[in-house]
Amino acid sequence: HSGKLARIQSANSQPALRTAPGARHWKLMLLEFGPNQGGAGGDIILLGDGSLAQSNLDRVPSDLIVDRCYIHGDPARGQKRGIALNSASTSIIGSYISDIKSASQDAQAIAGWNGPGPFLIENNYLEASGENFMLGGATPGINGLIPSDVVFRRNHVTRPASWRTANWAVKNLFELKNARRVLVEGNLFETHWQDAQPGYAIVFTPRGEGGAAPWAVVEDVTFRYNVVRNVAAVFNFLARDNNGASGPLRRVKIADNLFYGVDRSAWGGNGTFLQIGEGPAEISVEHNTIMQTGNVITAYGGTRQAPSAADRFVFKDNIVLHNANGVIGTGLAIGNDTLSKYFPGAAFYRNVLAGGNASRYPADNSFPTVAWLRDQFQDVATYDYRLRPGSSLRQSGSDSRDVGVGYTALIEGIGANAAALLGLPEPSPPVPSDRFKDRTRGRPPAYIRPGSGGQ
């Protein structure tokens, strides 16, 4: 319907729309914003100011809404950024942001670093070459600022596979470098390959910008009810900035997600589910179905004699392919050796690690063949990873739920219409069983404080 929308386009390299300091209560609705005609190096929409010109909260625009807008770069030369999100109390909903791409610099559909939040990013199409969505990544003009209270829900985050043969600089799909209380739920993340970075689709790495923002943290993040597919690798976690002072990465929960097509042969990279560096604390991974070609977990940091330990790590009730190395840390052996040194005291139980060796891992996990596991799903050929009726994996989780992703929660989270478009089937009713007792007593809790907004 772009032909029916009023169109705003910059005649030069400056934003087509920018807010005045302290602006309040503006709604942009049913508008098209085209590429900046004077150059592809800037923002199309500038909400707030990312520089020292916005050095206190009184100057931050707030109560802004971008609703059902079409925002796009030039198909041939792209655009650096769709929306610069340096405001407060801002919603971006129902909008379509495309052709945000660059061969020479990072390009983002939405990025913010000097706005306090809260932010609602819901029901959008976000297409970019660098980082489709990012918080942090530049020094805030406001001392001590951390973008907070973020809800990122039911978005389609992707890029065209045809860009792979072009020269656009591809980095990741979703990145947090400075953020607090973030809820990421019901999204589709897809089509990501190794290019200007190693290939991880989702990146949580606190960055203090060379010591200029040592307060930067990534904490209290919940990632649930998402589908991540057709990517080179999934998560890259780093406890602290390795290039200067920063705060920590901590309290992250990854629950009830479906990951498939995590394939290094198709997309480059290493096909790893989770790379975890320097020992971030209170990470919980539970009830996920993960079909990947690389490691389950790769840990690094510290030395072989004194690895960087991840305190209160939880990995339970997941279905995953073990592949060659499963859970492995730098300089250590697969399984128990890595767990005892990189994840001391970890709650690692009731997982299905298909193709793994039980002698290398804690008890109360299972290690079927990959062929057997494939037979437990409804139809792997059509990516239907529901457990079939009668499978012994039904209601075998520590909480008496099915191990792996809960399809009812996944479909409710992603939305029925989106689920239908994805080809996700309706969930099967549970099969009554008391074969397993709840063994969660005595286990360390996940220590999660989910994003406060929208719940």
Predicted regions and their residues:
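Right-handed parallel beta-helix/beta-spiral solenoid domain characteristic of secreted/periplasmic
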Residues: 1-43, 68, 73-75, 374
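Residue-level signal for pocket-adjacent positions within structured domains
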Residues: 3, 78, 105, 128, ...
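Pocket-edge structural micro-motifs
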Residues: 10-12, 30, 35, 206, ...
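Extracellular beta-strand/beta-solenoid scaffold signature
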Residues: 9-18, 39-57, 75-84, 103-115, ...
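C-terminal low-complexity, acidic/polar tails when present
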Residues: 238-240, 250-253, 259-265, 270-276, ...
